[in-house]
Structure formats: structure tokens, C-alpha cells
């Protein structure tokens, strides 16, 4: 499938997607889209940057059939995912060849699973979720749409992560705990109690830093 990649930083997700393709994934990157005007009209790793996500029609003209939305902000992924679908493009599930996804797990459209990540038995992962390299989604976990699981995250069995929640590097959620919608869990935090929606927590054990308003 020919893809447009949303997010064109050569030192970020763009390069990661191109490496995944080079590693044998059945895709071809034909264009990038990015909000950074300085990149428009340039090439990144040999692939042209055609404009912002609002210019998705240009990617369609370039032959794109689907899109990978590689943005770190959950809300941005949600917004851009809507633009992509409105343009008639597919949002394929993209799984690195060296990731493990259990046969009984489910992944929503537009979700990315990076190298050495694990999505275990009975896990249900929503749409446009970013499961970064080395993240662990244990058995019967539920992850809401547009959530971000940074590298090294660990989700214990039967835990839940809400829509648009962001888990920083190496964050851990112990078994059967819930992280609410739009919550932020800081890098290295260990969640041993439920996290309310729109709340930021950090530390070991994780404690509320501030409610988000």
C-alpha cells in the first residue's frame, strides 16, 4: 500500500516509519505531511513533504492510498485522523515485523505497534493508538482511541487506558488499574491506583501533580 506519513521529522517518527518499510513492511511512502512550514517543498529521507495535514488532497494526487499518523500528541492524532478519513484514505494497522501481537488481540485502524513491542492475549487496542517500541500491553488490557504508550511502558493485565491518555517513557500501570481519558502519566511513574480523567500524575508511586482543566 502506498502511504502518506503525517509527521516529517527526520529525527523522529518519519525515520522510524521509513526504517519499518525498509525492514520488510508491505508499504511504500510516497509523501509526508507536516505542520512545519519550513519543511514544505523539501524532501525528508528522499520523500517529498507536500504541505500540512490540511493538504491531504495533494497526497491523494501523489498516489497515496492510506496514511500513518505519526504524531506525539493524542489530540493531534485524533484531529488528523478525521482529515485522513474525510479524504477517503485508509488508516491501516501498522505493526513492525519484530513486534508481537497475540492472535486473540485486536487493534483498531490507524494503530502503530513498534519494534519489540508486545500486545498480549485478549488485549483490545483502539484506533490511532501509538504503541511505541518495547512497550508491553499485557493480557486483557483495554486501550482507548488515540492513546500514546511511549517506549518501555508496561500495562499490567486487565488494566485500562482511556482515550487520548499519554503515558511517558517507562511508565507502569499495575494490573486492573485504570488511567482515565486525557490523563498524563509521567515518565517512569508507577500507577498503583486509578488515575482520574484529565489528571497528570508522576512519581513512584504515582501521585497527582495537577488536575487538567
Regions found by a protein language model. Give the residues of each.
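Glycine-rich adenosine-cofactor-binding loop
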Residues: 1-21
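Short hydrophobic segments within beta-strands
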Residues: 5-7, 33, 70
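Short glycine-rich anion-binding loops that position phosphate/pyrophosphate groups of nucleotides
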Residues: 10-11, 72-75, 207
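Short amphipathic alpha-helical segments
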Residues: 16-19, 44-45, 79-83, 125, ...
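Phosphate-bearing ligand-interacting subdomains
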Residues: 37-100
